Amino acid sequence: MTLPRHLCLLPLSLSLLACSTPTPPTMGIAPPAGWQSPTASKAQALPDQRWWKAFASPELDQLIEIARNNSHDLAAAAARVRQAQARAVIAGAPLLPEVQFGLDASRQRLLRGEGNDQLDASSSERTSTSFDANLSASYEIDFWGGLRSARDSALRSLDASRLDRQTVKLTLFGSVADTYLQSLALKEQLRIAQLNLRNAQAVLSLVEARQQSGSSTQLELAQQRSLVAAQQRQLPLLEQQWQDTQVTLATLLGLPVQQLPTSTAAFADLRWPRIASGVPSELLARRPDIAAAEARLAAASANVQVARAALLPKLTLGVEFGSGASTFAQIFDSPYYTLTSGLVAPVFNRGRLRAAQQLAEAEQEELLEAYRTSILAAFADVEKALNATQGVDRQRQWQDQEVEQSRIAFQLAERRYRAGAETLLTVLDTQRSLYQAQDQQARLQLSQLQASVALYKALGGGWQADSPTR
């Protein structure tokens, strides 16, 4: 019998399909030679993995440790890693023979009729008992690498889950540091507001005394009282904002706000760290989110090979050892073995399998673009953090002078007003200028510290690429 022509060509087409392997995608993005910011340091030293200690705050150290042990986000990320580990074990199992053991017992009794070969109504054998034991093993020969690719995909997904956990940890610690710094800054702003309120109340007492003696008008008295009321209004606003940061901080730590440790640190005691940014080409090995995107891309590439292998025949080998008897005592008296082999090739479902391959290839293309996006986003994160560090540093140099000159102006205006040589309007202006300058000074100091946190995070927080999971 002659085979149809298209079936004769099937082995050749399968061989050609098996020999064509997918070309691994390239990154397609060349890192720049250096950072755009002129203040970027090209020192090769990585940030310390305990980067928060650079702020010299024992309270921040304590909060980070609480977050490490208590955070529900970190616990959820760890659970996702365990899920990926289980999937990797499941995906690797088909590479090994599947062995099963069976022990069966059955009993049949003829109720009516003439029976059959085992149950004969004309004899006394109206009941049949059998016992069987068997040990079987089956194994699929991985000719096309589909099973190995499925295992590799699961292992790369496991890598991605572990790297995601590192990203969650870095983000969590950065958020804890940011919120803690904001909390201290609000306490400092509250202290400044209280100090300026006392200054405004002292001027109000002076205006009231001058008004009683006829040296000041009712208008001047109302103006100063308005300024005092405005300063009073700032206090509950700042207290509310500080309470909000406490709630946010407690949530990050996985605690109710009532259990949040009491802070006694002063904002001025914090140290501003200088951070070496290195060069852009090093960033690819420093960021866990980039490594996770790369691992997902590798998993998608392996999935393409799995889809390609599904189009090819599968060869399965099997062996079974067994024995059976009519009594349990003789169950191993009649041993036997069975050898099997099977070849299965898709015929009528090739359209579905082709679509599955196209789906895997499209997912690979999507993850390649996501990988490229993560690289560009990482470069942008560092550039923005460097720009913020440089910009705030330059502003603070002038802000310190503004605070000093505003303080001198207020003191001079107050003395001249007491002497009757200056109007209250000048005193009011210098009071407002001093408060605004001091408040802005605290805000800039916070921005400077938060820019350092952002730069630590942008550089990967001291994380280094480990060898992939094997």
UniProtKB/Swiss-Prot annotation:
<comment type="subunit">
    <text>Part of the tripartite efflux system PvdRT-OpmQ, which is composed of an inner membrane component with both ATPase and permease domains, PvdT, a periplasmic membrane fusion protein, PvdR, and an outer membrane component, OpmQ.</text>
</comment>
<keyword id="KW-0449">Lipoprotein</keyword>
<keyword id="KW-0472">Membrane</keyword>
<protein>
    <recommendedName>
        <fullName>Pyoverdine export outer membrane protein OpmQ</fullName>
    </recommendedName>
</protein>
<keyword id="KW-0998">Cell outer membrane</keyword>
<keyword id="KW-0812">Transmembrane</keyword>
<dbReference type="InterPro" id="IPR003423">
    <property type="entry name" value="OMP_efflux"/>
</dbReference>
<dbReference type="InterPro" id="IPR010131">
    <property type="entry name" value="RND_efflux_OM_lipoprot_NodT"/>
</dbReference>
<comment type="function">
    <text>Part of the tripartite efflux system PvdRT-OpmQ required for the secretion into the extracellular milieu of the siderophore pyoverdine (PVD), which is involved in iron acquisition. The system is responsible for export of newly synthesized PVD after the final steps of biosynthesis have taken place in the periplasm. It is also responsible for recycling of PVD after internalization of ferri-PVD into the periplasm by the outer-membrane receptor FpvA and release of iron from PVD, thus making PVD available for new cycles of iron uptake. Contributes to resistance against ampicillin.</text>
</comment>
<keyword id="KW-0564">Palmitate</keyword>
<dbReference type="GO" id="GO:0015562">
    <property type="term" value="F:efflux transmembrane transporter activity"/>
</dbReference>
<keyword id="KW-0732">Signal</keyword>
<keyword id="KW-1134">Transmembrane beta strand</keyword>
<feature type="lipid moiety-binding region" description="S-diacylglycerol cysteine">
    <location>
        <position position="19"/>
    </location>
</feature>
<feature type="signal peptide">
    <location>
        <begin position="1"/>
        <end position="18"/>
    </location>
</feature>
<dbReference type="InterPro" id="IPR050737">
    <property type="entry name" value="OMF"/>
</dbReference>
<dbReference type="Pfam" id="PF02321">
    <property type="entry name" value="OEP"/>
</dbReference>
<feature type="lipid moiety-binding region" description="N-palmitoyl cysteine">
    <location>
        <position position="19"/>
    </location>
</feature>
<dbReference type="GO" id="GO:0009279">
    <property type="term" value="C:cell outer membrane"/>
</dbReference>
<comment type="similarity">
    <text>Belongs to the outer membrane factor (OMF) (TC 1.B.17) family.</text>
</comment>
